[in-house]
A protein has these predicted regions:
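Flexible, glycine/small-residue-enriched loop-and-beta-strand segment within the central core
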Residues: 75-86, 90-158, 179, 184-186, ...
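Terminal amphipathic alpha-helical/low-complexity segments used for targeting or macromolecular assembly
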Residues: 1-68, 186-190, 194-195
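Short, functionally important structural connectors and interaction interfaces within domains
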Residues: 8-9, 13-14, 67, 77, ...
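Short hydrophobic beta-strand segments in globular cytosolic domains
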Residues: 148, 154, 166, 171-172
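Short secondary-structure boundary/capping segments
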Residues: 13-14, 61, 107, 131, ...
């Protein structure tokens, strides 16, 4: 496969945000990743001691945080700025949200411990992987969704409103609203009816 043209006038960050192949260890992206790491550590340190301060740190870290959002540390992100979380959402310990592409989490979502939201993808071509190229696809979690502990949501997936993803499920394809999906790969096992 031919090497992508990285001299199209866009920065690696612009390429990343557009969903195109980019080089992840670009200095601008590396600095943004370090900033996110430091803010997540600051969030952890202030979580129990100073809730108001932890809320301010979360607002600095994430792209958008709705009212009443509660995130138990530790929290792991690539950049933070690509994550929006709707009001009333609860996130248990150990969320991994690799936000190379946008991650949108709706209102009143329940996220169990050690859930992973993984937007990065890597080329199948070994030469491109060796050259450190990667890309990403967005993840969208609808309103009032419950992600069970240890669930993994892969790049490009949308989960519809009111759906439940069972603990340990690996979500590789879109999940419609008002269903229960479990397993690897996640499969719909029950319809919940419209709400």
């Amino acid at each position: 496969m031919s090497t992508p043209d990285l001299n199209d006038g866009r920065s690696q960050k612009e390429r990343m945000l557009a969903g195109d192949l980019y080089i992840a260890d670009d200095p601008e992206l590396s600095a943004a990743s370090r900033r996110a790491y430091l803010l997540t550590r600051e969030y952890e340190a202030s979580f129990a001691a100073d809730p108001a301060q932890s809320r301010q740190v979360l607002a600095q870290l994430l792209g958008e945080v709705g009212d009443g959002v509660h995130i138990k540390p530790p929290l792991f992100v690539d950049y933070g700025f690509n994550i929006t979380i709707g009001a009333g959402t609860f996130v248990n310990y150990g969320l991994v949200a690799l936000d190379v592409a946008r991650i949108t989490i709706g209102r009143d979502v329940q996220i169990g411990p050690k859930v992973q939201l993984l937007t990065p993808t890597h080329p199948l071509d070994p030469d491109l992987r060796r050259a450190k190229y990667e890309a990403a696809e967005s993840i969208v979690i609808g309103n009032n969704v419950w992600l069970g502990g240890g669930a993994i949501v892969l790049a490009g997936v949308s989960i519809g409103d009111n759906s439940v993803i069972g603990a340990g499920a690996v979500v590789t394809k879109n999940v419609p609203p008002n269903v229960v999906a479990v397993g690897n790969p996640a499969t719909v096992i029950r319809h919940l009816g419209a709400h």
